Amino acid sequence: MHHCFHHIPKTGGSSLRIRLEDRADKKQISKLDYAVGHNTTAKTPGTHFVWLRDPLDRDISHFNYDMEKDEAQANTFEESCKLLAGNFMTLWIYKDYLLSDPTDDVETKYQSVRQALKDNFVKVFSIENFEQSWNEVADILKVDREPRLNTNRSNEDYKKYANRKNLSEEFISWHKDYNSYDYLLYEEFCT
């Protein structure tokens, strides 16, 4: 059976890929039995899994990554967020997983994504519980849970330009409003 792990940026896909590649190198699973990355879609045959992340934490991580790569839209996290469309996870799943028309209104996108998370995915995981979700994935794939490779390399790979503790309550409230559909998905499927 083919297992598809759709990776929304900054939701643990690299960590998962490193662990699966380790198990494939040890001949516990064939690389033909799974797909992990940004390019799996609703049309990819197999059982589908996805991780969501707290929207503010995901956006902070994405900003820090972009800053390190000199690809950020602005010099501060707050400025950067205000330049973006918002609801990154909703828009990503709608366009890149469902392959749907990106010009549709955001309510349509949200409702379609919500239904897809219910119907298309065997499991929607929370990145905040990655180790427990890894246990489930390892058991489904019948691969060893251990070793748990140190796969979260962000502290070593790039500097933290933005941090949740340095954000004002006013900005956090704005972020929740501006990304309301992402928060709704996260609350429904991950809390």
Enumerate the predicted regions with their spans.
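Membrane-interface amphipathic segments in extracytoplasmic regions
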Residues: 1-191
